[in-house]
Amino acid sequence: MPEGPLVRKFHHLVSPFVGQQVVKTGGSSKKLQPASLQCLWLQDTQVNGKKLFLRFDPDEEMGPPGSSPPPEPPQKEAQKEGAADPKQVGEPSGQKTPDGSSQSAELVPQGEDDSEYLERDAPAGDAGRWLRVSFGLFGSVWVNEFSRAKQANKRGDWRDPSPRLVLHCGGGGFLAFYNCQMSWSSSPVVTPTCDILSEKFHRGQALEALGQAQPVCYTLLDQRYFSGLGNIIKNEALYRAGIHPLSLGSVLSASRREVLVDHVVEFSTAWLQGKFQGRPQRTQVYQREQCPAGHQVMKEAFGPQDGLQRLTWWCPQCQPQLSEEPEQRQFS
């Protein structure tokens, strides 16, 4: 699943289409029925963590003043630099996907908190005007171009990826959404205090959450406190902070938790800026065999017993496990 920086890039790609009417639709989505969007007007787009929200209206009226918040500082600064490839963006340091973008091969949940949203074929009245887009493992947005196969799939076919949704707009351009789930909702779920890339990100709330008596690698992936944070950011922030992924938050000092939050924000912001400047975000431990110091990197799946196990990379020498911390086997 694309992490916060990449989804914000998707938001940037979609934004120029706001104010245009959808004149033609396409795509393979069966739950959404792409034809239900034809003749609607794209009036707004918002982003929160790993989710993208698009507002559609049946007429050309604009939304209420202030419905779309101004760009956040990291995004605004990055936009000034300009994007190297405005058509499509991918993940750093991963394997090649069927459409040629770079992604991790690990399993990830296909959408979070789906029960909060109603899936309908079309918006009804004032309700359901916001289309919520949750991207899958190889999720992407393309502008005025379709994704093409750059390698054969497992069956040996050179079949181009099929977009879930295609929106041709009155301005002459089109958007193609790949590997995503879409559902209608009455309003966007936007909580800036939890978004790691928002200027309103609540550090105090995040620090309090990190103090829980559970491995910090679990807490970092909790979107209630670190919206937009995924497995890449988790691994890189922990390595840069010198914290073992299974360290209990309750045994870490306040200063170490502060350092960890600093690295979460710094790495995420640098990744976002790199997206707009056409620079790949280099990782130091994620999917690496050695850390920058030349030590062997360990890899294992960690997660709650009743939750998803996520692949985790760490350096035992740079991120030592303290004696008062539990053994790894208790949490793997």
Swiss-Prot record:
Phosphoserine PTM sites in chain numbering: 68
Q: Name one GO biological process term.
A: base-excision repair
- Give the main localization category: nucleus
Localisation per UniProt entry: Nucleus
Q: Which superkingdom heads the taxonomic lineage of this protein's source?
A: Eukaryota
List the catalytic residues. Answer: 2 (schiff-base intermediate with dna), 3 (proton donor), 50 (proton donor), 310 (proton donor)
Q: Where are the zinc fingers (FPG-type)?
A: 284-320
Q: List the Gene Ontology MF annotations in alphabetical order.
A: class I DNA-(apurinic or apyrimidinic site) endonuclease activity; damaged DNA binding; DNA N-glycosylase activity; zinc ion binding
Question: Which SMART domains does the UniProt entry name for this protein?
Answer: H2TH
Q: Which reaction does it catalyse?
A: 2'-deoxyribonucleotide-(2'-deoxyribose 5'-phosphate)-2'-deoxyribonucleotide-DNA = a 3'-end 2'-deoxyribonucleotide-(2,3-dehydro-2,3-deoxyribose 5'-phosphate)-DNA + a 5'-end 5'-phospho-2'-deoxyribonucleoside-DNA + H(+)
Where is the segment annotated Disordered? Answer: 56-121
* Modification sites for N6-acetyllysine: 50, 154
Composition-biased stretches (Basic and acidic residues)? 74-84
- Pfam families, A to Z: H2TH
Family membership noted in the UniProt record = Belongs to the FPG family.
What does the UniProt entry state concerning the protein's domains?
The zinc-finger domain is important for DNA binding.
Q: Quaternary structure per UniProt?
A: Binds EP300.
Protein name, UniProt field: Endonuclease 8-like 2
- Organism of this sequence: Pongo abelii (Sumatran orangutan)
Name of the gene encoding the protein in the UniProt record: NEIL2
